[in-house]
Amino acid sequence: MSRMAEQQLYIHGGYTSATSGRTFETINPANGNVLATVQAAGREDVDRAVKSAQQGQKIWAAMTAMERSRILRRAVDILRERNDELAKLETLDTGKAYSETSTVDIVTGADVLEYYAGLIPALEGSQIPLRETLFVYTRREPLGVVAGIGAWNYPIQIALWKSAPALAAGNAMIFKPSEVTPLTALKLAEIYSEAGLPDGVFNVLPGVGAETGQYLTEHPGIAKVSFTGGVASGKKVMANSAASSLKEVTMELGGKSPLIVFDDADLDLAADIAMMANFFSSGQVCTNGTRVFVPAKCKAAFEQKILARVERIRAGDVFDPQTNFGPLVSFPHRDNVLRYIVKGKEEGARVLCGGDVLKGDGLDNGAWVAPTVFTDCSDEMTIVREEIFGPVMSILTYESEEEVIRRANDTDYGLAAGIVTADLNRAHRVIHQLEAGICWINTWGESPAEMPVGGYKHSGIGRENGVMTLQSYTQVKSIQVEMAKFQSIF
């Protein structure tokens, strides 16, 4: 693909030049080619976007629930019509295989938007009788202008996960995509406008997180920030949001999730789940089950099943339908993952497979890392303690249910957890003791629109998807009505 035209900001229904004068480049990680130069939003651009959003939000909130629902449903239709076009752009920008982006990223994002479009008429208040002449009623009102700050691993899906409930509740959103993968969020803005969204209701500001993101979190005109990213950045976002204007926040901050295989499990099923929990999207999924606990007596058999499945991984041309494994999203990220792999070797973990870059067959110029499985791991190892966000699985052994529950919970993170077992009683008994916000039994990874997702501990605050997320983009107003004569004590 030839280099794209310089990408601008999207404010008030159209493209506009950034006032900052700064730009950055977005790279195709499969081959290192520059996809586009992108303009970076500065402080004045954030001010412009907020003013635009304030104007648009008043128009949007004044529409009926059915009017808003119809517009969002039109956006869903356009997303599905352009699924392949958007998936190709997502593959170029992220490096993910087209077989994945064309069946997951836009599809699931559109599902979430359709879900919230259908929920809009269900945003209701309540009536509370107090006595014969006195009652209270409540209204759910939009927050106003909110900000979404996205991560680089699921660019358009995250933009939809954040904008869908916000817009459904009558808010306007200013979205800052990751500077690593900014392209499809701009296309989403075009689609919203084409569907009939009033100008200003969805503005997109590409830029560097430490600048553009900080300006958004500090701006007094923004009522809430929804952030997806790392813990350190999340703490800064939360601190800035509180210090500026006590903004509400939703935080999704990653994890180091346990996958527990019990001795009664079907090891073929367990191996299939472990593969998806570690190598889907080349390991760049926040919920990945990178700490795989297996009974000591099952370790050797489990390892053989994993090795057999690693052989089925197909890296190569990301647009080949048979390719199911792409490069990492960027060269700096690849280098960071490789540093973790070196650390694992130094600390005594045994490499079962992988452990280096992938080369040959057109891969030499890309950010490729081989699917890597470490075994003979221990809880104190760096690769077991820290989030790597790459194709790196750690296999650990255990002896008892009590032991594995304790060790699974021995982490600052609490985003996800899963177990594989044939015993239904054990499944629920153990899941109820795991300190994680998203749990799977005999499966892994699916996050449907109806399912609230989010973390415990350092993995986040608040939830995305589900009914409760729609409500989190509203504020409740209570109105007391007295029908009798008011009695004053004076």
From Swiss-Prot:
Enzyme class, broadest EC rank: oxidoreductase
Recorded metabolic or biological pathway in which this protein acts: Amine and polyamine biosynthesis; betaine biosynthesis via choline pathway; betaine from betaine aldehyde: step 1/1
Modified residues (Cysteine sulfenic acid (-SOH)): C286
Binding residues for K(+) 2: L246, K457, G460
CDD domains: ALDH_F9_TMBADH
Gene3D superfamilies: Aldehyde Dehydrogenase, Chain A, domain 1, Aldehyde Dehydrogenase, Chain A, domain 2
GO MF annotation: an example: betaine-aldehyde dehydrogenase (NAD+) activity
Amino acids binding K(+) 1: T26, I27, D93, V180
Cofactor note as given: Binds 2 potassium ions per subunit.
GO biological process, one term: glycine betaine biosynthetic process from choline
Residues flagged as site, Seems to be a necessary countercharge to the potassium cations: E248
UniProt-annotated catalytic positions: K162 (charge relay system), E252 (proton acceptor), C286 (nucleophile), E464 (charge relay system)
Keywords, alphabetical: Metal-binding, NAD, NADP, Oxidation, Oxidoreductase, Potassium
Quaternary context: Dimer of dimers.
Family of this protein: Belongs to the aldehyde dehydrogenase family.
Role according to the record: Involved in the biosynthesis of the osmoprotectant glycine betaine. Catalyzes the irreversible oxidation of betaine aldehyde to the corresponding acid.
This protein's name: Betaine aldehyde dehydrogenase
Gene: betB
